[in-house]
């Protein structure tokens, strides 16, 4: 569900490798802004802040990540409590405590000679058609592969 950062939840080594662990996506799919934080990085070069429509991830993130882009929660997202894991029933409430929380959506890191790139954008394949997201995705993968 959270892709690379939601795999192998029981593996601390994996979490240290990827630099984050997916927690949730309050409000499901909705509009939010992506803010470019490292405009001078080759992955982000020429990309300005942009609006995005998808799941806005809340994650536990390693402070050693080199954050390339973030999103900020508005605090009006709706969070639905699961009465049982995987259940769609439960109480819903507004996430006021998240107001102003800045969450990384793209980062890179190095471990030894290895390079790791992560982007939380792209819940559906058609999101790769979003011009800014597509550039970040491609450039990040190229950076990690060299």
What are these regions, as identified by a protein language model?
Residues 125-134:
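A short acidic/glycine-rich loop-to-helix N-cap element
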Residues 5-21:
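Extended active-site neighborhood of metal-dependent phosphoesterases/phosphodiesterases
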Residues 1-7, 113:
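Short alpha-beta junction capping motif
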Residues 20-112:
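Catalytic beta-strand/loop cores that center a nucleophilic Ser/Cys/Thr
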Residues 119:
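Phosphate-centric recognition/catalysis
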Residues 139-146:
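C-terminal alpha-helix
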Residues 10, 39, 43, 133-137:
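Stable alpha-helical elements in mature extracytoplasmic
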Residues 122:
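Catalytic cores of NTP-dependent nucleotidyl/adenyl transfer enzymes across multiple folds
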């Amino acid at each position: 569900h959270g892709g690379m950062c939601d795999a192998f939840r029981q593996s601390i080594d994996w979490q240290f490798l990827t630099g984050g662990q997916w927690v949730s996506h309050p409000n499901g799919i909705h509009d939010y802004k992506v803010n470019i934080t490292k405009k001078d990085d080759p992955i982000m070069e020429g990309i300005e802040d942009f609006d995005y429509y998808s799941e806005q991830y809340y994650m536990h993130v390693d402070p050693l990540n080199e954050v390339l882009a973030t999103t900020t929660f508005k605090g009006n997202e709706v969070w639905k409590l699961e009465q049982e894991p995987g259940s769609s029933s439960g109480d819903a409430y507004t996430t006021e405590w998240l107001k102003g929380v800045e969450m990384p959506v793209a980062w890179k890191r190095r471990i030894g000679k290895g390079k790791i790139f992560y982007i939380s954008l792209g819940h559906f394949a058609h999101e790769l058609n979003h011009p800014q997201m597509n550039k970040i995705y491609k450039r990040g993968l190229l950076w990690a592969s060299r």
